[in-house]
From Swiss-Prot:
The keyword RNA-binding applies. One of its GO terms (biological process) is cytoplasmic translation. Belongs to the universal ribosomal protein uL22 family. The gene is rpl22. The lineage of its organism: Archaea, Methanobacteriati, Methanobacteriota, Thermococci, Thermococcales. Keywords: Ribonucleoprotein, Ribosomal protein, RNA-binding, rRNA-binding. InterPro entries: Ribosomal_uL22, Ribosomal_uL22_CS, Ribosomal_uL22_euk/arc, Ribosomal_uL22_sf. It comes from the Archaea. Part of the 50S ribosomal subunit. GO terms for cellular component: cytosolic large ribosomal subunit. PANTHER family: 60S RIBOSOMAL PROTEIN L17. This protein binds specifically to 23S rRNA. It makes multiple contacts with different domains of the 23S rRNA in the assembled 50S subunit and ribosome. The keyword rRNA-binding applies. This is Large ribosomal subunit protein uL22. GO terms for molecular function: rRNA binding; structural constituent of ribosome.
Length: 155
C-alpha cells in the first residue's frame, strides 16, 4: 500500500521526536506561512500561548513576506502585521495533536521544542458563481497543508 503523503522534514528520530500534520485546511497559505515562521523554534507551550493571544487579538503576527498594503500594528518598532484568527485556530489544533502524539510516545510535554513547522499549498477548490446574462464568475478557495515536528530538549 502506497503512502498517502510524506513530511518534508528529514532525519526523523522516533525516540526523541513526534510529528503531526493536517491536510487540505481551508485557510490562507500566505498567512499560514507567516504564522509558521513566527512559531518555528519556540517551545511548544509558548507557541500555544502565543496562538491564544493571536486568537484573542492581543498580539499580532508580523508579516515579513506577504505584507503589501498592510498597516503597522501597535507596539514599539512593530511593522506590518495582522491577527489571522482562522489560521491560528487551525495551527493550534495541529500543535495540540502533536503534543498528544508526544505524550503517547512518553515524551515530556514541557520540554518539547518546535524544530520544524511548515505550510504548503494544497489543492484549489474550484467553484462558480452564476451571474447575469448567462455568465459565470469563478471563485477558487485555496487549501493548505500544515506539518509540525517537535523534539524533546534535554536540559
Amino acid at each position: 500500500m502506497a503512502k498517502r503523503f510524506g513530511y518534508s522534514f528529514q532525519n526523523f528520530d522516533p525516540k526523541r521526536m513526534a510529528r503531526a500534520s493536517a491536510r487540505d485546511l481551508r485557510i490562507s497559505p500566505k498567512l499560514a506561512v507567516e504564522v509558521c515562521r513566527e512559531l518555528r523554534g519556540m517551545m511548544l507551550n509558548d507557541a500555544l500561548r502565543y496562538l491564544d493571544d493571536v486568537i484573542a487579538l492581543k498580539r499580532p503576527v508580523p508579516l515579513k513576506r506577504y505584507n503589501d498594503s498592510q498597516g503597522h500594528k501597535p507596539g514599539k518598532g512593530f511593522g506590518p502585521g495582522r491577527y489571522p484568527v482562522k489560521v491560528a485556530k487551525a495551527i493550534k489544533k495541529v500543535l495540540l495533536n502533536v503534543k498528544n502524539n508526544a505524550v503517547q510516545k512518553g515524551l515530556d510535554p514541557d520540554k518539547l521544542k518546535i524544530i520544524h513547522i511548515a505550510a504548503h499549498k494544497g489543492p484549489v477548490l474550484r467553484g462558480w458563481y452564476p451571474r447575469a446574462f448567462g455568465r459565470a464568475t469563478p471563485f477558487n478557495e485555496q487549501t493548505t497543508h500544515i506539518e509540525v515536528v517537535v523534539e524533546e530538549i534535554r536540559r
